[in-house]
Amino acid sequence: MKRFTLVVAAVFAVTRSFGAVSCEKYDDGRPDKSVRNEFNKMYPDAKDVEWDAEAGYWKVSFEKGNQPNRIDHEAWYAEDGTWVRTVSEYPVAKVPQGIKDLLSGSQYGELPLEDREVEYFETSSYGKFYRFDLWQNGREIKIDVHESGEVLPASYDVM
């Protein structure tokens, strides 16, 4: 009986350790080592990592955190490993109140939200901002609320 208990404990420990290991998938080949190194430096605790080549960039989808607080992210890198942007999906409830106040005090403040998720952009060229999907006259519009206080229609590509 003692041996059986030890075997069960060992199997449990091994399977738990596999669950904590981050697996990587490469759908479009494998990015250069400089790209992978930059990603690993920026996001050492990333889980469920998937790489894709898209529009001349490497896009890596990953998760951070544990349930129920796990957050989905996408980081984009140039071919040389230069970080371009990271987009994270947060529940509206997790958006800082100051950002929500900026949106509600703007001309878009009365428009209903399209869904309960908000994208948070960190970019190398446009700074940091939250992107809200809102409904206006039966169609979806995207509004960016910058941490600097600007509230603007999302009219530019963030690459």
How would you describe each model-predicted region?
Residues 79-114:
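Long, charged/polar, surface-exposed segments that mediate recognition or autoinhibition
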Residues 57-88, 131-158:
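Amphipathic N-proximal alpha-helical interface segments
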Residues 1-30, 39:
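Bacterial Sec-dependent N-terminal signal peptides
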Residues 47-66, 112-131:
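A cross-family detector of function-defining hotspots
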Residues 39, 46, 60, 99, ...:
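Short, structured motif recognition centered on aromatic/hydrophobic residues
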